[in-house]
């Protein structure tokens, strides 16, 4: 899991917003007015450079699949996107520990209600008809390995994407010279029964081309020292060194043209 975040409560006069923030569970760390940062699990501002998002999204439309608390949807709005659709189901409909109220509170506090729309929709239901057409840019961050039918969802995501897909997911078996995947029955991966698959880099690139993307580029992988440090920590905690060392996160850009 990503590193824990810290929370900075609001300045005098921000008590109402601070209290609302404190009453909700947060996965994303989002800077809100008044010096308030939501107490998220992920330090999003720190990891944001890994994604190599376009510096300007002026005039672009963006689809954020698995938006959760909305950090990346709001970041797209900050970068000038003309229309952002935050889409989620698991984190908003009560199946997960997230709450849609957190997304709505952050959107309202940031003043993005006119730019960032939301839709409760499962990734398996995505289609241009279901979400109102194609989007220039699609974000699929931390979603793919939770899906029972990842290839089917990739086809749906490709149909909804006009230019660029940013994909972030679990990855392993990257030392193999051919496409490969690992399956995790039950709660074998990180103790989470919703974690199903890890693909290696070759497999991800091949699947992205198969579903309709013309080119792919890996923009981030954990360096060796980072994987070793994480594996050593897990071994100290009585967990598997090998599993942690060979598992990683990977971010790819896939383009239509």
Regions found by a protein language model. Give the residues of each.
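Conserved N-terminal segment of class I S-adenosyl-L-methionine
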Residues: 1-135, 181, 232-233, 246-257
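Short, contiguous strand/loop micro-motifs
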Residues: 38, 59-61, 140-141, 190-192
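Active-site flanking residues adjacent to catalytic metal/cofactor-binding acidic residues
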Residues: 63, 87, 141, 167-168
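S-adenosyl-L-methionine-dependent methyltransferase catalytic module, highlighting the catalytic core
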Residues: 124-135, 139, 148-257
């Amino acid at each position: 899991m990503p590193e824990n975040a810290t929370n900075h409560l609001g300045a005098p006069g921000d008590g109402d917003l601070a209290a609302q923030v404190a009453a909700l569970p947060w996965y994303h760390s989002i800077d809100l007015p008044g010096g308030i940062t939501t107490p998220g699990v992920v330090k999003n501002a720190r990891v944001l450079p890994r994604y190599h998002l376009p510096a300007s999204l002026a005039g672009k439309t963006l689809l954020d699949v698995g938006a959760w608390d909305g950090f990346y949807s709001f970041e797209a709005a900050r970068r000038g996107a003309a229309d952002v659709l935050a889409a989620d189901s698991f984190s908003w409909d009560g199946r997960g520990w997230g709450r849609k109220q957190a997304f709505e509170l952050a959107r309202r506090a940031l003043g993005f209600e006119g730019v960032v729309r939301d839709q409760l929709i499962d990734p398996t239901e995505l289609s241009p008809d279901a979400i109102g057409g194609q989007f220039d840019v699609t974000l699929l961050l931390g979603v793919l390995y939770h899906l029972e039918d990842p290839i089917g969802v990739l086809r749906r995501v490709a149909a909804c994407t006009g230019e660029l897909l940013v994909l972030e997911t679990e990855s392993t078996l990257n030392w193999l010279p051919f496409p490969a995947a690992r399956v995790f029955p039950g709660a074998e991966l990180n103790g989470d029964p919703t974690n199903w698959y890890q693909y290696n880099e070759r497999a991800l690139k091949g699947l992205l081309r198969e579903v309709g993307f013309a080119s792919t580029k890996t923009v981030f992988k954990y360096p060796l020292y980072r994987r070793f440090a994480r594996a050593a920590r897990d071994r100290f905690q009585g967990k598997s060194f090998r599993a942690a060392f060979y598992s990683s996160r990977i971010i790819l850009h896939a383009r239509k043209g």
